[in-house]
Amino acid sequence: MARSVVLVDCHWHLTASEFDHDIGSVLEDAKTIGLCALVAVAEHSGEFEKVIELSRRNAGLVFPCLGVHPVQGSATGPQRSATLQDVEDALPMIEQYRDELVAIGEVGLDFTPRIACTDDQKEEQRNVHSRSAGRPTINLLRDQGAEKVLLHAFDGKPSVAMEGVKAGFYFSIPPSIIRSEQQKLVKQLPLENMCLETDSPALGPEKQVRNEPKNILHSAEYIARVKGISLEEVIEITTKNALKVFPRLCHVLPK
């Protein structure tokens, strides 16, 4: 692969416990395959400090997003729907670190307007979870006047995704696409609306095996095969798309 080719992982979970013992080697492996920017998302305010701390420690490679996932829970307790209190707890910290963030995320259907809904925030970049809620999520974002939107690991119908394309939204494709029922999505989406992600440690090429950012090449290779174009072209265009979604990444990429 040419040295000038660079990759962006638009969505992964840096603070997941699965990475606690070897995060350094995970990041080194990511750099080895050409990843130059990894967008790390948070799901609740309890993760915010760790996301910020690790992004500062790995400045120039890891870039933070802070948000409230629509499903809250832990390994020791049951899952529950996020509440407005979760959002209220998160907002002061999001504001505190706003200058360091590349986007708001991970957010979902119920709370995207609450976190970014004013006229001044319409251009706020958003990293969005829309599982089982593709059409209402797209409609809501469009009604809010959102402009820079990434819908990660979209699981809706391709026809619904095309409504997002018409609104100018982007869709990131994880490595699990090689074994996914969503392969029709890749066939129909224009490459100009695609980005790459891993959603590590989930959505890897193999079930029940920890996913890592280095596996992002599985996404790119699959897209190249389906579209009948070179891997280099897929990487070049998806990276350009990532810079449109996350303009703050522009200055860190090789010229």
UniProtKB/Swiss-Prot annotation:
Cofactor binding, note field: Binds 2 Zn(2+) per subunit. Exhibits AP endonuclease and 3'-exonuclease activities in the presence of Mg(2+) and Mn(2+). In contrast, in the presence of Ca(2+), shows AP endonuclease activity exclusively.
Compartment list: Nucleus
One Pfam family, short name: TatD_DNase
Amino acids binding Zn(2+) 1: 11, 13, 106, 199
Source species, domain of life: Eukaryota
A GO CC term assigned to this protein in UniProt: nucleus
Listed EC numbers: 3.1.21.-
Signal peptide span: none
Protein keywords: Hydrolase, Metal-binding, Nuclease, Nucleus, Zinc
Any one GO molecular function term: nuclease activity
Residues at which Zn(2+) 2 binds: 106, 129, 152
Enzyme class per UniProt: hydrolase
Regulation affecting activity: The 3'-exonuclease activity is sensitive to the metal ion present in the active site, whereas the AP endodeoxyribonuclease activity is observed in a variety of divalent metal cofactors. 3'-exoxonuclease activity is suppressed in the presence of Ca(2+), Zn(2+) and Ni(2+).
CDD domains from the UniProt entry: TatD_DNAse
InterPro entries on file: Metal_Hydrolase, TatD-like
Positions of transmembrane segments: none
Cofactor: Mn(2+); Ca(2+); Mg(2+); Zn(2+)
Family of this protein: Belongs to the metallo-dependent hydrolases superfamily. TatD-type hydrolase family.
Protein role: Exhibits 3'-exonuclease activities and apurinic/apyrimidinic (AP) endonuclease (in vitro). Show preferential AP endonuclease activity on double-stranded DNA substrates and 3'- exonuclease activity on single-stranded DNA.
Name assigned to this protein: Putative deoxyribonuclease tatdn3-B
